[in-house]
């Protein structure tokens, strides 16, 4: 059995991976996301970011050849504009105000790299999420919890912002940060049967 390494500091991703894998390591990627410019193709962009994270971690473990490294990146898109993590409370407010009453997309790029063979597979998942109309007070109260500050699009569906979601079309776990169904099929493609 290959050793599985998650190239992420995200507690949400770690919790989700524990649902399908009993044993894996965490090695945080030091990949510079700004090294990949966004060029209007969101699926390609998130897959490139995920691959960058996986390759960054693989360089740290070159002496261990029975490893598979999982890289993942999630972002929110609204009107073909990428919404990353908010810079500050004002930025979070503007993001949530834009999403209010509207549908947006959540994209996750996945990359799985076999360190020994250097074989890599990448894929992505897109989930459509529609928010109810939010009041300024709702947005401010949510921002004051601190919850949105480390999340793409300034919200976490698994937390208090779950009440903002009117409907979802696609993988719920993708919106949380790790699309388990897609990850499972990619792991199977790399010879890992869960």
Swiss-Prot record:
Keywords: Cytoplasm, Hydrolase, Nucleotide metabolism. It comes from the Bacteria. CDD domains: Maf. One of its GO terms (cellular component) is cytoplasm. It is found in: Cytoplasm. InterPro entries: ITPase-like_fam, Maf-like. GO terms for molecular function: dTTP diphosphatase activity; UTP diphosphatase activity. It is an enzyme of class 3 (hydrolase). Signal peptide: none annotated. The record marks 12, 74, 158 as: Important for substrate specificity. One of its GO terms (biological process) is nucleotide metabolic process. Its EC number is 3.6.1.9. It holds the Pfam family Maf. Nucleoside triphosphate pyrophosphatase that hydrolyzes dTTP and UTP. May have a dual role in cell division arrest and in preventing the incorporation of modified nucleotides into cellular nucleic acids. This is dTTP/UTP pyrophosphatase. It comes from Clostridium botulinum (strain 657 / Type Ba4).
